[in-house]
Amino acid sequence: MSYKIVTDSSANLTDEQIESYNVDILSLKYYIDGKEYDSYVKGVPTDYSETYSLLRQKAKITTSLVSREICDAVIKPILEKGEDVLVLAFSSGLSGTYQNIENAAKDYREEFPERKIIVVDTLCASLGEGMAVHYAVKLKNEGKTIEETAKWVEENKLKICHLFTIDDLFFLKRGGRLSGSSAMIGTLLGIKPLLHTADDGKLYVTGKVRGRRAAVEHLIKSVGERGTDIQNQEVFIVHGDCEEEAKYIASEIKKRYKVKKTVYNYIDPVIAAHAGPGTLSVFFIGDKR
């Protein structure tokens, strides 16, 4: 039976990936000065330059979850066409988006009893979630059933490593992860926190280094040290409007570890509102997170 893979905008897939994967996107929303924006609009090239400019000015950006209205607009037409749906959702440890989608899916299962609707809590974020989509699409294209594909994601999602560094401690302070005094001292000393997404799908600080260069080097080395059969993987990278550094990481990963392909993209505004400009992250498959 034919099925469609759906994910949300927090997967941070590039426009090219969305097209080549043939996936549908549930857009999260964000708000600046009371004006509503969609993180993703089908057919409209992604451009977050204005949002990042406002973030650098410390503008307050608020965010919201995937709504029932968005679920109805994206998922119901697929079901009405007679296709099943596999949704790979943003980590429940960071957002209520998964639960909102699952609540909608319960109603769809009653309305379309002949259809299969599977919603997976990926416990992933950004292009880590995008990596789960990447492998799911490969399995689908190989002829795997919706159940087989969902099972693979469930069994392997905790092998998708998410490693981050945040450049501006203001955003950790604003999010309550860092005290004001610690943020001030850390900024003066050039401290850069190192973070990862753990098995519970939440973000934790795992260490710190002095200086941006050391933080970038940590990300690069971690790929080589922790990646499984890394030369045969695709490594994904996201950046908070610091594309040249993302390109540098991609180049070094290819040079040092013979990685065949890397993909990099912007962090969407919903995540950037909490992480800030200058954030960098790498995603790859390891034995564990």
Could you describe each region identified by the protein language model?
Residues E36-N100, K106-E110:
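Class I S-adenosyl-L-methionine
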Residues K4, S10-D24, K29-K35, L94-T97, ...:
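Mixed-charge interfacial surface used for oligomerization/domain docking
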